From Swiss-Prot:
It comes from the Eukaryota. This is Homeobox protein EMX2. It comes from Bos taurus (Bovine). Residues 225-234 have a biased composition (Basic residues). It is found in: Nucleus; Cell projection, Axon.
Length: 253
């Protein structure tokens, strides 16, 4: 009536000898989006496969999936159409060592070390033309422009501080002669322990001061004369007296 169920053998030999239906299990796996992109590839648009491969590699590098190896496993388990050439997807460590080329090139303003600095400072070349030969070759840099600009300025003359004895002797020499040149200036500079340039500059400044004082004195004298004449005229008008030019002196003879 009822037959006993056959006993199953769970020995190692029976388990190893048993073939697992790999094709069936593979067919039951869920289809992932990456597999759909490979399955839908066609020879009409060969660049689409390369785009999906790069997108999958970038997603793996950013950590979109919990395990980056899943993306590469999908690519292996679902090969694309053999008629269309597909670039292989590099592993994550290769992506880290060799990043994908950026589609945006750096702005030309940031590549200053590769450009001629004279294009940045055209006004400087126009202003200091005699320094133009220095801004050529490997030395052309913004630092060299600023350095040459600072060196191009004429240094300010240091004002000499004369001692009282030196000023006294210079004043005596100026009273004798307002222009000291040649051997006289050289001898005066040597006696005062000064340079000829210092003596020359002092005499130039002293002549300028002398001319200014003379003009001020002449101006003050003319103003005093005008003031005196004005007061005399007012007194004559008030007293109704004639000026000496208007008095006619005649003799009785």
């Amino acid at each position: 009536m009822f037959q006993p169920a056959p006993k199953r053998c769970f020995t190692i030999e029976s388990l190893v000898a048993k073939d697992s239906p790999l094709p069936a299990s593979r067919s039951e796996d869920p289809i992932r989006p990456a597999a759909l992109s490979y399955a839908n590839s066609s020879p009409i648009n060969p660049f689409l496969n390369g785009f999906h491969s790069a997108a999958a590699a970038a997603a793996a590098g950013r950590g979109v999936y919990s395990n980056p190896d899943l993306v590469f496993a999908e690519a292996v388990s679902h090969p694309p159409n053999p008629a269309v050439p597909v670039h292989p997807v590099p592993p994550p460590h290769a992506l880290a060592a060799h990043p994908l080329p950026s589609s945006h090139s750096p702005h030309p303003l940031f590549a200053s070390q590769q450009r001629d600095p004279s294009t940045f400072y055209p006004w400087l070349i126009h202003r200091y033309r005699y320094l133009g030969h220095r801004f050529q070759g490997n030395d052309a840099s913004p630092e060299s422009f600023l350095l040459h600009n600072a060196l191009a300025r004429k240094p300010k003359r240091i004002r000499t501080a004369f001692s009282p004895s030196q000023l006294l002797r210079l004043e005596h020499a100026f009273e004798k002669n307002h222009y000291v040149v040649g051997a006289e200036r050289k001898q005066l500079a040597h006696s005062l322990s000064l340079t000829e340039t210092q003596v020359k500059v002092w005499f130039q400044n002293r002549r300028t001061k002398f001319k200014r004082q003379k003009l001020e004195e002449e101006g003050s004298d003319s103003q005093q004369k005008k003031k005196g004449t004005h007061h005399i005229n007012r007194w004559r008008i008030a007293t109704k007296q004639a000026s000496p030019e208007e008095i006619d002196v005649t003799s009785d003879d």
